[in-house]
């Protein structure tokens, strides 16, 4: 990838220095592992094998989450699953294990033509029941989803209306059968990879941008 580490020339040009080090693990990282048909994966794996022949007794690793799914020939001595632990790889068959519950702070009725949020970017087309929730772009709900994203009550989408604020977001709950105590960022049919696509980014960025105010509970 030409980011860090040694290329082929640097490796063989410094073998004496390298062999004097207490080596424990030889690492590389696949540049195109998220594209299973990309021939660069094979090319990079073969180069890795060639370079590792210089250190036959040292453990080797080239695969992170996506690389692990490319097959056993990419596993070597160790794999490094990261986002895969959270099921954040589309069409992988992995169980989706992330859920973010967002508490409702207030619900109220707005009339037709009333406006919502900074710069009044949303105007109600009819009388609506809305809810304001305790999450915003400081927590990882990006502003790009203003007036186009959604949160969920069970599997029912609740459209985001108005601009997403630093700490707050407002959604339309007119169609819900009850007033919810909280909504969720994801649903069984709308997971991290779908959320990332709507944000025009990747799942990794979505997850690392989740703020410290979001409590983590592992079960």
What does each model-identified segment do?
Residues 1-111:
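Active-site loop/helix belt of alpha/beta enzymes
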């Amino acid at each position: 990838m030409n980011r860090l580490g040694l290329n082929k020339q640097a490796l063989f040009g410094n073998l004496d220095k390298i062999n004097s080090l207490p080596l424990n693990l030889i690492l590389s990282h696949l540049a195109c592992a998220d594209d299973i048909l990309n021939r660069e994966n094979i090319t990079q794996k073969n180069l890795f094998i060639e370079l590792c022949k210089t250190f036959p007794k040292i453990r080797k690793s080239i695969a992170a989450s996506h690389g692990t799914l490319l097959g056993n020939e990419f596993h070597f001595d160790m794999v490094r699953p990261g986002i895969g632990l959270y099921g954040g790889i589309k069409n992988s068959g992995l169980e989706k294990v992330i859920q973010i519950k967002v508490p409702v702070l207030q619900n109220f009725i707005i009339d037709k033509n009333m406006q919502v949020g900074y710069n009044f970017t949303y105007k109600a087309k009819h009388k609506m029941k809305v809810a304001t929730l305790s999450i915003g772009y400081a927590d990882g709900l990006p502003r790009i989803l203003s007036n186009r994203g959604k949160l969920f009550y069970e599997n029912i989408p609740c459209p985001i209306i108005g601009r997403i604020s630093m700490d707050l977001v407002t959604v339309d709950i007119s169609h819900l059968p009850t007033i919810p105590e909280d909504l969720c960022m994801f649903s069984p049919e709308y997971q991290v990879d779908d959320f990332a696509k709507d944000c025009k980014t990747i799942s990794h960025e979505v997850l690392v941008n989740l703020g410290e105010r979001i409590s983590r509970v592992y079960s």
